[in-house]
Amino acid sequence: MSKQVFETVFAGKKLVVETGQVAKQANGAVVVRYGDSTVLTAAVMSKKMATGDFFPLQVNYEEKMYAAGKFPGGWMKREGRPSTDATLTARLIDRPIRPMFAEGFRNEVQVINTVLSYDPDASAPMAAMFGSSLALAISDIPFNGPIAGVQVGYVNGELIINPDQAQQEASLLELTVAGNKDAINMVESGAKELSEEVMLEALLKGHAAIQELLDFQNQIVAAVGKEKADVELLQVDPELQAEIVAAYNDDLKKAVQVEEKLAREDATNAVRETVIATYEEKYAEHEEFDRIMRDVHEILELMEHTEVRRLITEDKVRPDGRRVDEIRPLDAEVDFLPNVHGSGLFTRGQTQALSVLTLAPMGETQIIDGLDDEYKKRFLHHYNFPQYSVGSTGRYGAPGRREIGHGALGERALEQVLPSLEDFPYAIRLVAEVLESNGSSSQASITAGTLALMAGGVPIKAPVAGIAMGLISDGTNYTVLTDIQGLEDHFGDMDFKVAGTRDGITALQMDIKIDGITPQILEEALAQAKKARFEILDVIEATIPEVRPDLAPTAPKIDTIKIDVDKIKIVIGKGGETIDKIIAETGVKIDIDEDGLVAIFSPDRAAIERTKEIIAGLVREAKVDEVFQAKVVRLEKFGAFVNLFDKTDALVHVSEMAWTRVNKPEDLVEVGDVVDVKVIKIDDKGRIDASMKALLPKPEGYVEPEKRERSEKPRRHKEHKEKKDNNFGEFKFHKVDKK
């Protein structure tokens, strides 16, 4: 295939697709250029069906640092494991693509997205999502797409498609929505307490914008698309299925309706084990034993799937006996742990999360160095899901994609209500430990996080609660479920997580297993979620009515002082000499950010106050009409130099010493004297003139004497000059004669 180029304009930026030139051995490959972001997407499929009971789809998103003209960090100077952002982007692409493959498709599929050049104003993740769909669509892989996705922002009351970097920074909404022609099938969002109405409008606007991208993909597929491969789908033997259903369906129905999770699992497992043992014995010598037993396992899964859905849609009964809009029993507790900076335990039915708060100086913030400019991440929310939470053994090690994704969702939900850095100069870390799980553990971790923050004295704007909504749909009729449990998530069609305050939504996440959902379902789910969210907020507020006024005794003491940006170098000093001297003197820890916010950390409040005084003195500037008690540090023929504060001197001319004529400064003052002076002038070079007589009453009948010419002699004495090499920015040390 020769190179072909397709071009359009989307959201004000050029969108160019190239095919037939690179990665030609892949089943499908495209180069997508959006603005100046360039992504290569290659899709490949295995020749044979994989073993296992799931579809082995793998989506990768690789950030190459050369794309932004940067060297990779670390000693190796080479890209290693994906960053958290890259992992989240891969999940973002996987989720809308996965439902678009046929039921029973088991061939392994890999979709690899490589960012080759990066433009911060043109979303590389959205280019990768577009490229992933298109690479699959033009390939021979049996993909029932296309899909597409867009980002939606909300700036000054206006919804914006694919906002640029400046618009993103000003936006109250960070929404990614994906779908096909008929419906939305993936949502990921953080928001600053926006209403359900605004969120729904944003979702619909995003879906409308997607249509343009879908049309563009269809044009390309029509021009270069391959014929789809004829692959084997996993299908069970219908006669075997009918036989097992007839013999064991009644037993499975009874097992599924056991309300308690562990007892229900025991009951369903007993039925499964009976069926499996029966057919293992029956077909032990059969030449297709492996295929038959694979079918038996698949049939049992289908039977349970069918019965759970039938109970909900026909009998209007959920496996645990709840109504469709009913939340499981709730319980909340704070101060579960001693010595930590804050803790909250939240239980919803058989799902339980413990959240633990840790506060630290800003020096502990995480430095993020990716394709964007390096920045410091102040708030971290980590989610851990040990296997004991579901009563089983399993992998134990570093967090996987699911744990990273759930942690990020909680982070988005809670960061919207955190106090500003100026009001609360701490790095904040929340760790959610899932202790029990029967569905919706990510939302339990959000609610537990709110409890921990409030108990720890972090002045959040409002409590945040989370709830997971589900859906059972047969294509014509549907039922929206509130607070889905594990079985409803596993056999249902939707997992729609909504977190927020009483004033609005702070985070959304939606994954579905069908082609898409309609605006009507979205609206109904958002309304039910709001009602449920308020019920959970009632429990939070009954447990801890307001944020505690003080931090935990074990939490670090931190205070701040704001300085001008151009004064930062004065506080730091040459080679860090000044700040090191302050730290050595007071025993504190000091962090200074690029905006001039100085955070001072110490367990000793007196040390913090002393440090603030020192820094305030270093950056202090005298003002005209300000009055000081100043020490005389040097005498000249034309006047006296006095120290106003720290390293700041002023000249008191002999004519400003008294209302009467003064011939020599030493007639009135000596070095070491302390005198009251008033600042009367600061010239454009920063030189300060002060007056003693301005603070004295003017004699009656006073006549202004003729002024003498001001000497042009340098105002700094010899010792100042000798210290020139030890300056801190524009700041000079001087010695004070103590004789």
Curated annotation (Swiss-Prot):
Keyword Nucleus applies: no
UniProt superkingdom: Bacteria
Compartments, record wording: Cytoplasm
Residue span, S1 motif domain: 625-693
KH domain ranges (all copies): 556-615
GO molecular-function terms, A-Z: 3'-5'-RNA exonuclease activity; magnesium ion binding; polyribonucleotide nucleotidyltransferase activity; RNA binding
SMART domains: KH (SM00322), S1 (SM00316)
Gene Ontology biological process terms, A to Z: mRNA catabolic process; RNA processing
Catalysed reactions, as listed in the record: RNA(n+1) + phosphate = RNA(n) + a ribonucleoside 5'-diphosphate
Coiled-coil stretches: none
Predominant subcellular localization, coarse grouping: cytoplasm
Sequence ranges of Basic and acidic residues compositional bias: 722-739
EC number: 2.7.7.8
InterPro entries linked: ExoRNase_PH_dom1, ExoRNase_PH_dom2, ExoRNase_PH_dom2_sf, KH_dom, KH_dom_type_1, KH_dom_type_1_sf, NA-bd_OB-fold, PNPase
Gene3D superfamilies in UniProt: GHMP Kinase, N-terminal domain (3.30.230.70), K Homology domain, type 1 (3.30.1370.10), Nucleic acid-binding proteins (2.40.50.140)
PROSITE patterns: KH_TYPE_1 (PS50084), S1 (PS50126)
Function: Involved in mRNA degradation. Catalyzes the phosphorolysis of single-stranded polyribonucleotides processively in the 3'- to 5'-direction.
NCBIfam families named in the record: polynuc_phos, PRK11824.1
HAMAP family referenced in this protein's UniProt entry, alphabetically: PNPase
Protein name: Polyribonucleotide nucleotidyltransferase
Organism: Streptococcus suis (strain 05ZYH33)
Encoding gene (name): pnp
